[in-house]
């Protein structure tokens, strides 16, 4: 959680800084590298400011700082109660749903990819698909033996869920942008 939180936090911070420069001076973001990868074009859409007209990356800065702190706390030996984990699960799920919504819009509606956004997608996908089986195994969703056993069974194989999620995104990008690798 700590390393993933820091990687996503840094990407969100970079997007926020470059989005600010784009709005202030019109300076092209560093991730505008070709006709397909254009963070600047993505940042100028309504999808980039969904909640309260606040840039999405500001939510990422706050959210991933929390994720990194949770990871650091666990590494330091903290034990957190079930309510905390339920709220963490709700936050991670909301972020996952939001990021997959943003992925869909970037690929199929906006028509541009954002490299830093893709880093956040990749990191959060890994966090989510490891966290869910861990939470099941830890009894966060209740002590139903079937849920606990299911989590214990899936946790060592959570990488499969991550690969499937990455494959769906990768195939969607290849289908939607068939000329992407011909540049």
Question: Where on the chain are the PLM-derived regions?
Answer:
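Membrane-interfacial helix-loop segments of redox and metal-homeostasis proteins
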Residues: 1-183
């Amino acid at each position: 959680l700590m390393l993933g939180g820091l990687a996503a936090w840094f990407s969100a911070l970079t997007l926020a800084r470059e989005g600010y420069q784009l709005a202030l001076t019109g300076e092209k973001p560093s991730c505008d590298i070709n006709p397909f990868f254009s963070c600047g074009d993505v940042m100028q859409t309504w999808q980039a400011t969904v909640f309260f007209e606040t840039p999405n990356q500001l939510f990422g800065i706050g959210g991933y700082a929390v994720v990194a702190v949770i990871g650091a706390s666990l590494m330091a030996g903290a034990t957190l109660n079930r309510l905390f984990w339920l709220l963490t699960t709700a936050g991670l799920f909301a972020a996952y749903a939001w990021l997959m919504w943003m992925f869909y819009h970037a690929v199929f509606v906006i028509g541009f990819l954002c490299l830093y956004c893709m880093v956040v997608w990749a990191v959060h996908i890994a966090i989510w698909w490891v966290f869910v089986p861990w939470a099941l195994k830890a009894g966060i969703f209740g002590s139903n033996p079937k849920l606990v056993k299911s989590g214990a069974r899936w946790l060592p194989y959570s990488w499969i869920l991550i690969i499937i999620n990455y494959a769906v995104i990768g195939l969607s990008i290849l289908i939607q942008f068939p000329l992407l690798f011909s540049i």
